[in-house]
């Protein structure tokens, strides 16, 4: 599982960008979310996700908000 931050949300097409802690950027679509709706996401929000290569770079999937410490 990777950890990163949502850097950009495109609300009109329901997709966005995530940057991991190593600086790699991955795109994602609303279908890649796990137990959260696209409208609940915020830019600069910390998230956990899986990543795989795609024709457009990297694709993030199984995206979910990073659990707060102690939970």
Feature locations, PLM:
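Short nucleic-acid-contacting surface segments enriched for D/E, G, S/T with interspersed K/R
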Residues: 34-48
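OB-fold/S1-family single-stranded nucleic acid-binding modules
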Residues: 52-71
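A short macromolecule-binding patch
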Residues: 24-32
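Residue-level recognition of conserved beta-strand positions in structured domain cores
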Residues: 18-20, 30, 51, 62
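Short acidic/polar mixed-charge low-complexity motifs
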Residues: 22-24, 45
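Short aromatic-glycine-enriched beta-strand elements
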Residues: 13-17
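A generic beta-sheet turn/junction motif
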Residues: 11, 21, 53-55
